[in-house]
Amino acid sequence: MPSISVRRLFDDNQYKLQLAWAAGNSGADNRIGVEADKPVLALVGHLNFIHPNQIQVVGLAESEYLNRLESGETGYQFGDLFDISMSLVIVANDLPVSPGLRDYCHKNDIPLLTSKLESPYLMDVLRIYLQRTLAASSVKHGVFLDVFEIGVLITGHSGLGKSELALELISRGHSLIADDAVELFRIGPETLEGRCSPMLRDFLEVRGLGILNIRHIFGETSIRPKKILQLIINLVEADDEYMKQLDRLSIRTETESILNVNVRSVTLPVAVGRNLAVLVEAAVRNYILQLRGKDSTREFLERHQTQLKENEQNHENRPD
């Protein structure tokens, strides 16, 4: 199961969530991970001794209860209630940290952080962060682009011209997200997000030209940090025989399964004289039309059937 350390969570969210260490620094390497019987959203919650979360957040009500606990009003001790499995405690709302809580976290190597933000907002941000960070992931070979605001993954065997095609699309105003190794994360039941590793960000390798820094050549708008994957365009090498056998009126919808998510796919034959950049743009425009309920192939076939019926009726009504 994927997991991250408390140290990484702190580094990634220190400024956004105004986090600061209060105790338990020795537990910075504690792991926060997905459990088989719990969704990611259940990792974070207000202080709960019955159904404890890995990240326990102390808000106004929880802070008041801890103060009563420390004063002896409840008849319980800290050790009686805190003998639970947790990776991190965050005191929100800029509240003072209870001395008893600080001592307990220090003795048991449980990281204790503070935040000036209100607890509901804090938990919402952490849930979104953990959902993205702990998402199931896979790496696909290809070039990932933003074409007309649609995330398009171009795949195919080496040497078919994927990078050259990507370069032409970028020169036409579209944006590069990742080249060669596209990192895909399932951030929702039916949603894949594509990203680029920090090592490869901004770069595109083109045979004969070497490695190009797309951001420096084409400007800031030529690069996108991430995008939802919506369409896969698979390039295949085609000869005359392949082109003859190609179904030119196919109404089947092709999909490819990645991380148990079905993604719409289109196969484009690569042959001499074909303008692939124009074909990719047309495929994306056609996909957008289909999202709006318009299918050109079905529309043509319906028109064809209507014309045949009209011709048949005219033939029957024609006097001998």
UniProtKB/Swiss-Prot annotation:
Its cofactor is Mg(2+). CDD domains: HprK_C (cd01918). The active site is at 141, 162, 180 (proton acceptor), 248. Keywords: ATP-binding, Kinase, Magnesium, Metal-binding, Multifunctional enzyme, Nucleotide-binding, Serine/threonine-protein kinase, Transferase. ATP binds at residues 156-163. Residues 204-213 are annotated as: Important for the catalytic mechanism of both phosphorylation and dephosphorylation. It comes from the Bacteria. It holds the Pfam family Hpr_kinase_C. InterPro entries: HPr(Ser)_kin/Pase, Hpr_kin/Pase_C, Hpr_kin/Pase_Hpr_N, P-loop_NTPase, Ser_kin/Pase_Hpr-like_N_sf. It catalyses: [HPr protein]-L-serine + ATP = [HPr protein]-O-phospho-L-serine + ADP + H(+); [HPr protein]-O-phospho-L-serine + phosphate + H(+) = [HPr protein]-L-serine + diphosphate. It is an enzyme of class 2 (transferase). GO terms for biological process: regulation of carbohydrate metabolic process. The Walker A ATP-binding motif also binds Pi and PPi. Both phosphorylation and phosphorolysis are carried out by the same active site and suggest a common mechanism for both reactions. Catalyzes the ATP- as well as the pyrophosphate-dependent phosphorylation of a specific serine residue in HPr, a phosphocarrier protein of the phosphoenolpyruvate-dependent sugar phosphotransferase system (PTS). HprK/P also catalyzes the pyrophosphate-producing, inorganic phosphate-dependent dephosphorylation (phosphorolysis) of seryl-phosphorylated HPr (P-Ser-HPr). This is HPr kinase/phosphorylase.
